[in-house]
Amino acid sequence: VVSCADILAVAAR
């Protein structure tokens, strides 16, 4: 699964 931190890291790009 994908963690919230991973989602935020991609969204921050």
Swiss-Prot record:
Binds 2 calcium ions per subunit. One of its GO terms (cellular component) is extracellular region. It is found in: Secreted. One of its GO terms (biological process) is hydrogen peroxide catabolic process. Its cofactor is Ca(2+); heme b. It catalyses: 2 a phenolic donor + H2O2 = 2 a phenolic radical donor + 2 H2O. Its main location: secreted. Signal peptide: none annotated. Keywords: Calcium, Heme, Hydrogen peroxide, Iron, Metal-binding, Oxidoreductase, Peroxidase, Secreted. GO terms for molecular function: lactoperoxidase activity; metal ion binding. Disulfide bonds: none annotated. Its EC number is 1.11.1.7. Removal of H(2)O(2), oxidation of toxic reductants, biosynthesis and degradation of lignin, suberization, auxin catabolism, response to environmental stresses such as wounding, pathogen attack and oxidative stress. These functions might be dependent on each isozyme/isoform in each plant tissue. Belongs to the peroxidase family. Classical plant (class III) peroxidase subfamily. This is Peroxidase 2. The lineage of its organism: Eukaryota, Viridiplantae, Streptophyta, Embryophyta, Tracheophyta.
